[in-house]
Structure formats: structure tokens, C-alpha cells
């Protein structure tokens, strides 16, 4: 990792209340290098620069960290190249993380990173949360579900409902979201979920507005 990008990772993590130890920085460096290498042959991400990955994948993933308690069982829906689930596991080692994606090559990459970084308490699953077999395996299993790039918020909430424990939390990571849209979602989902919190912020080192929506299953 270039010194400039290392500094961006450190300062960006600090902005979210995370103090990255040297070992964590080295792990992120390995993740970064492997992602860029694999991405030359497999379309894992449209972001192809070190700086872009550090900001738009690593820091964006870490932005939700303070909303996830330790020892939480977390399902990352549509996890792609492992975001946000793998970075969250890297900094919150007590999490029990399940990654699920419908693209086998992306799941193969996730498994490669998990092995390379020797991460425990994390699994990568090839499948779709819409599939009956997946639902039967995962019904009422998770404290939290999270989605960063999977479908729209309403679809994510619908698919999460059976997989969450009662009182569990569905976390939607989204771009700029208006107050009107937030209130509309809250009203539409009122019978199944309660909007517990929503947080808007600007992603460090960018002008990108982001919104985190936390819905509690009723």
C-alpha cells in the first residue's frame, strides 16, 4: 500500500472511532493487493486503484462499525468482494460473520481472503437469500443483516425478515437519502420493522454523501 493510502486508511478509520493496529494495517494491505490482482482476471469491483479501494470499499465498510456490537451474528447479503463483512470482521474479531453472494467467483475470492488472513468465525456461502434452501438453513439465525450494494432497501428488508431473530436489526448502507424517502420507508415497513436510527455523513476524503439505516424487526 502506498504511504499516502496507508495514511488515508488510518485517518479515515479514526474518523469512525477505529484505531487500527499495525497488524490490521498489514492485513488490509494484503486484502488490497489480492483484490487488485484478482480483479485483473475476475470482475470483482469496478474500482481499480489503491486509493479508490481504500476509500470506497475499506472506509465505507468501516463506517458502520460503531452500530454493530461485539459478538453479533451478522449476515452480509450480496457481499461481492467481501464488503462490508470482511473489513468489519478484521476490526471486530468477536463478530460471527456469514457472507452470501450469488456469484461463485466472488465467493471463491472471499474464501481466499479468509484463509489468507486466517480469519476465524466467518464463512462465505454461494447462494441467494431468495432461495428456499437458504432460507430454511438460515431462518431466524442472525442478530443483524447488512447490505451495502444488494438490491433496493425494501427488497433487502423483505428478504432479511425471515433470517433475523425477533428484535434483530437490518442495516442498509446507502448513498444520499432524503428525509422524505426515509420517512416513506419507515411508514411502508412499519408492520414488520421499526426504524431505530438513521445516520447521514460524508465519506472521508470524498464529497460522497452516505446514509446508514437501522431497522429493528418487530
Kindly label every feature range from the protein language model.
Residues 18, 42-45, 51-52, 56, ...:
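Flexible, active-site-adjacent loop/turn segments at secondary-structure boundaries
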Residues 1-71, 75, 105-108, 112-122:
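Class I SAM-dependent transferase core
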Residues 94-98, 102-218:
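S-adenosylmethionine
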Residues 81-94:
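Conserved SAM-binding loop of SAM-dependent methyltransferases across substrates and taxa
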Residues 78:
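Conserved glycine-centered beta->alpha loop in an early N-terminal alpha/beta scaffold
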Amino acid at each position: 500500500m502506498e504511504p499516502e493510502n496507508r495514511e488515508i486508511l488510518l485517518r479515515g478509520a479514526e474518523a469512525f472511532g477505529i484505531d487500527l493496529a499495525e497488524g490490521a494495517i498489514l492485513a488490509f494491505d494484503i486484502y488490497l493487493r489480492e483484490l487488485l490482482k484478482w480483479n485483473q482476471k475476475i470482475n470483482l469491483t469496478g474500482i481499480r486503484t489503491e486509493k479508490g479501494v481504500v476509500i470506497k470499499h475499506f472506509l465505507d465498510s468501516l463506517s458502520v462499525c460503531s452500530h454493530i456490537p461485539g459478538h453479533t451474528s451478522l449476515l452480509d447479503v450480496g457481499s461481492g468482494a467481501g464488503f462490508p463483512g470482511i473489513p468489519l470482521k478484521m476490526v471486530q474479531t468477536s463478530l460471527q460473520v456469514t457472507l452470501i453472494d450469488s456469484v461463485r467467483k466472488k465467493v471463491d475470492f472471499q474464501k481466499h481472503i479468509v484463509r489468507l488472513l486466517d480469519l476465524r468465525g466467518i464463512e462465505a456461502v454461494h447462494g441467494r437469500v431468495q432461495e428456499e434452501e437458504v432460507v430454511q438453513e438460515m431462518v431466524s439465525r442472525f442478530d443483524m443483516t447488512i447490505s451495502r450494494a444488494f438490491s433496493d432497501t425494501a427488497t433487502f428488508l423483505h428478504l432479511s425478515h425471515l433470517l433475523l431473530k425477533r428484535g434483530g436489526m437490518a442495516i442498509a448502507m446507502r448513498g444520499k437519502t432524503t428525509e422524505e424517502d426515509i420517512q416513506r420507508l419507515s411508514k411502508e415497513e412499519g408492520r414488520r420493522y421499526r426504524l431505530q436510527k438513521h445516520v447521514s455523513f460524508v465519506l472521508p476524503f470524498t464529497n460522497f454523501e452516505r446514509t446508514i439505516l437501522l431497522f429493528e424487526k418487530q
